[in-house]
């Protein structure tokens, strides 16, 4: 399936929905392999962690995290990563001009070359800003989960999750502040995968 997405990404000239599906599929594949590894490795410390009462909250965090990764992929494939060139504001304001209808049109035309994106700036801002707002929501949810886990025998897991979350937020901010250096963008993707 990933091979097909790779082929379509090139043959359809970087059509954003295909590129997003390809990147998102890679994250899902990595997550499944990681899950299989953790199950097969049978780490003993995982048997002693009592987090059953927080599974619901963890599941909500996971769903929002998958949505956030989709938004990150959509931001990347629509070349919207630099639509908000400042931080914490976006184009000097907290409520910039945004066009959600165009920004989240999943049925973009097949045929044109999407290299560097075809969307107008307000559409790109809507995409980028959605990624930022969802990051705030996800951070709040994960901090609640970390706080809950901190007072169980899963405190080491909570502190690790907190450090990875802090690193991910820092990389996201650095992407904007330092105008998207490739090594920071790659690290942002790798840490997103680690959060899964």
PLM feature segments, named:
Residues 1-196:
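Polytopic transmembrane helical bundles with strong interfacial aromatic enrichment
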């Amino acid at each position: 399936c990933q091979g097909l997405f790779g082929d379509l990404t090139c043959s359809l000239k970087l059509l954003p929905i295909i590129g997003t599906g390809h990147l998102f599929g890679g994250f899902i594949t990595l997550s499944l392999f990681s899950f299989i590894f953790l199950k097969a490795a049978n780490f003993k410390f995982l048997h002693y962690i009592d987090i059953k009462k927080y599974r619901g909250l963890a599941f909500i965090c996971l769903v929002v995290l998958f949505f956030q990764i989709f938004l990150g992929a959509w931001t990347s494939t629509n070349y919207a990563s630099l639509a908000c060139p400042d931080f914490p504001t976006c184009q000097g304001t907290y409520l910039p001009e945004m066009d959600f209808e165009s920004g989240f049109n999943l049925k973009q035309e097949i045929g044109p070359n999407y290299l560097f994106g075809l969307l107008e700036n307000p559409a790109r801002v809507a995409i980028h800003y959605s990624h930022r707002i969802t990051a705030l929501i996800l951070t709040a949810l994960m901090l609640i989960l970390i706080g809950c886990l901190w007072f169980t025998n899963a405190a080491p897991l909570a502190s690790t999750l907190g450090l990875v979350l802090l690193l991910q937020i820092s990389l996201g901010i650095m992407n904007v502040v330092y105008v998207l250096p490739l090594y920071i963008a790659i690290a942002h993707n790798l840490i997103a995968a680690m959060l899964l």
